[in-house]
């Protein structure tokens, strides 16, 4: 795309688009994670085991979220991404509100599946739009800002879910967080503009050219060794993160006799503020050090994960609630370093017409490893530990969890080693 023919996108439009997408992603995580603060009252009301609650909070959502993300990303590489995001937002918000009507495990599972189907259309489209708005040197920072929707959404979900459930019951919590997303979808449709594809890189996708299939994109990515290690490391990091986020509220309720309001407030702060700082710091440090040595785009994550391991172990061994929260803030912060740079490097590894599908392939790996298996595995381990540790079964289940980050750190180290060569092979396809 020549400078003369390329339309000018103002900084105001870039910032507005990024800002709206952050708000959308915030609602994405409010609705995704609201169940984690409601596990205990739903378990008692509907008579569901820890393993069953793990399936509801993770697997029921994540299987459909992960698998449908790729075909919907294929749509995003062909269709208006703004419209797909707005429609997806309306679907998942409506299904969140309907979760409040569930009377048994299966009805709640259907509602969670609906949330997963709706949310599958969000991030691949958003990543593709932001990659078209921001050049490579700013992309990790932009995607880190977008990823702030994760800790902000979790924080507000914890705050609102705990307080509303204590005051009005768990069903009302679903209604209150679901309905505003329907209104936000109208804002997306009416005010967000679709950017030209390849704009930030001075490229123009050939719209007459046949789009690559999901299989072709996946085959392209797996020939890049940096992607294989990056996706594996990201999946393992997500495995730790989703298991922790899902079960930490229940741990503090059971181990420290906190109310839902108290657990929601304190964990909202810990998951929100250190988590947000970790996302921003990870993106900024990756851009800063990666500009000097490409390997450090991902080696920054390696260092962060190694430091997180002892902090996580200590957090679940202490007997004082405030010290546990303080120690937990460090692995929460460091465990979020991967967010911006992981997705930014995948956007850099993918040609223009593959970007939305490439993001979806990565999301599939992250969510299949992390969200499909993470929450139910913690619950299953907790159920298995009951005979040995009784009331501390969940404590020791979560204690073991953090050590998986050692495995994740190895893959980020290897990914950084291969990254420069793989980026150099990317053509303007």
Residue ranges and their predicted role:
Residues 3-10, 198-231, 255:
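Juxtamembrane intracellular "pre-TM" segments in multi-pass secondary transporters
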Residues 35-36, 224-279, 335-339, 343, ...:
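Extracytoplasmic gate region of multi-pass secondary transporters
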Residues 38-67:
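Extracellular/periplasmic helix-loop-helix junction of adjacent transmembrane segments
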Residues 47, 80, 101-107, 135, ...:
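Helix-breaking motifs and short loop linkers at transmembrane-helix boundaries and internal kinks
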Residues 67-103:
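Conserved MFS/SLC helix-loop-helix module at the cytosolic interface between two early adjacent transmembrane helices
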Residues 111-151:
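Cytoplasmic helix-loop-helix junction between adjacent transmembrane helices
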Residues 146-194:
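Helix-loop-helix hairpin linking two adjacent transmembrane segments in secondary transporters
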Residues 187-191, 311, 315-316, 399-429:
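Multi-pass alpha-helical transporter architecture, strongest
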